[in-house]
Structures are given as C-alpha cells and as structure tokens.
C-alpha cells in the first residue's frame, strides 16, 4: 500500500523497478555515481552506531559505496547484490581503495547468509526496490540480538529552477513511466517496515550537502540512473544524453555545478 505521507509512490517505483537492470549501467555507475559522502559515515560513528571489528552486511550493495566506507572504518563487511556486473566493478574499486570486502550474488529478501551473524545490516539507496516486508524480515533474521539496521538514502533534490528539476523533466519526456521524480529524500514508511519486523529504538537522521558535478559527470550520473540506461535501450539512452548535454550547455553553463543532496536514514535495533 502506498504511504500517503511519503513524497514518492514507492509501490509504483518498485513496479517500475521490475524492468530495471543496473548491470547495464555498471561502468557509468562506478565512474560517475557519487557514493555516500563522508558526512554519512561521520554520522554513523558520531552516534556510536558502528565500530571497528563489527560484522556488517550491506544489502543491495551495488558498486560497494556503503560497504567500502564501512570497511574503511574497520568493519568486516559482506555485500549482497543481484547484479554481477556491479559486484565486478565493486571489486575493482575495492582494490583501488585498499580494502577487502566479501561479495555474494543474492537478494535482500533471501541473502543465504547465516542467521544472527551481523552486528549491522545496511541498505543504501535501494530499499524502495525490495519486497520490503520480506527484506525487513531478512534483516531481523541476520541481526544478532542488539544489532542495528540502517536504511539510508543520498538523494538529489529537485528545487524550482535547478538542474535536478530540469533533468527530471527531461527524463520524464523520454521515459514517462519513470516513478522517481519529485522526491524529498525522506521515507517515513521505512520506520514502519523496521517496526513490523520487530526492531525497536527507531530513529531518523538527516543532513543536507552539496555535491559538485561537471557536465560530463552529471550526464554519466544520470545515464546510470533507473530512469535512463537501466531501463531505456542504448539508442534511446544516446538520444537522451545528447539532449541533456545541450540542456546543460544552454541553461546551466557554469562548472562544476553544485547539486543539492539529502542524506537521510532510518535505523532500529533488534531487541536482546
């Protein structure tokens, strides 16, 4: 059921996701899609939610942006994703970063990992793609008593007249079925998901940051999104990309562009 308090129709977004394959975007995804920034990991450590030596599972890990950040904090991390091309890119990025992460092909709803094996389970920028009740149940199964779940987002913010709003309008012209426009980066329904899975001590946190993008990088970031190369064929993606390049030159010529983003998370603890 759609949550009327939520800015995006997450049911429609998940239905749209049935035709999305991020594996098709793996190169752009790894090169241009900004991962969670340092402010996100600082938030986790400042709140005492992570610590060296903990065991973590990162669901829907993609190219490893959250997993790598956790590994850099001294956690033992396993990343789970259904798209093997993204895991291949993640391993390349790990080598460059000098961290070691275990990756397994699987889904958030059925990871195949042992029960009560994780101190921390994370899901970054992906919860809306899952069968949420099943994924939340899997989170509870994976956590040790006292373990913590963190569902996080790093969303661009479409504001009147800004490049994000113009880009979203262009995506919709090329892909009218895309359900990801108009977001605020806040997802209150995720708290209900965690509560229904038995987690308590629920909290949210957020911080707004600006992410710099050149024209080339923004085009790559948008190609890597669900509404473009992950769901359009190569020819339609190329046409879209050319129009976006022209739009940026015409309406947003200054580089780098400052793209407003919101870090937002929901977290809860499995009772001991």
Model-derived regions, located:
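Conserved class I S-adenosyl-L-methionine
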Residues: 2-51
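Conserved Class I S-adenosyl-L-methionine
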Residues: 3, 188-272
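Nucleotide donor/acceptor-binding cores
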Residues: 53-54, 116
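A short acidic, Gly/Pro-enriched loop at the edge of an enzyme's catalytic core
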Residues: 111-120
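Short catalytic micro-motifs in class I SAM-dependent methyltransferases
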Residues: 125
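A short, conserved alpha-helix within the catalytic core of class I
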Residues: 130-138
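Conserved catalytic/acceptor-binding region of the Class I
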Residues: 140, 144-211
């Amino acid at each position: 059921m759609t949550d009327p308090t939520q800015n995006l129709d997450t049911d429609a977004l998940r239905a749209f996701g049935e035709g999305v394959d991020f594996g098709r975007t793996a190169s752009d995804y790894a090169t241009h899609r900004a991962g969670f920034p340092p402010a996100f990991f600082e938030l986790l450590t400042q709140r005492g939610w992570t610590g060296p030596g903990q065991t973590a599972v990162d669901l829907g890990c993609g190219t490893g942006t959250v997993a790598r950040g956790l590994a850099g904090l001294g956690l033992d991390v396993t990343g789970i994703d259904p798209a093997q091309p993204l895991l291949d890119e993640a391993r390349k990025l790990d080598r460059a970063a000098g961290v070691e992460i275990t990756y397994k092909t699987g889904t958030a709803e059925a990871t195949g990992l042992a029960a009560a094996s994780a101190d921390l389970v994370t899901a970054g920028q992906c919860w809306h793609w899952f069968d949420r009740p099943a994924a939340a149940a899997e989170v509870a199964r994976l956590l040790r008593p006292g373990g913590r779940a963190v569902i996080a987002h790093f969303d661009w913010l479409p504001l009147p007249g800004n490049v994000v709003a113009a880009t979203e309008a262009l995506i919709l012209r090329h892909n009218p079925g895309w359900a990801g426009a108009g977001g605020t980066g806040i997802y209150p329904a995720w708290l209900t998901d965690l509560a229904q899975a038995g987690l308590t001590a629920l909290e949210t946190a957020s911080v707004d940051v600006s992410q710099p993008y050149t024209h080339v990088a923004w085009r790559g970031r948008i190609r890597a999104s669900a509404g473009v190369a992950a769901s359009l064929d190569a020819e339609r993606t190329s046409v879209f990309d050319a129009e976006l390049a022209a739009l940026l030159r015409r309406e947003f010529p200054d580089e780098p562009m400052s793209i407003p983003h919101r870090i937002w998370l929901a977290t809860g603890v499995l009772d001991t």
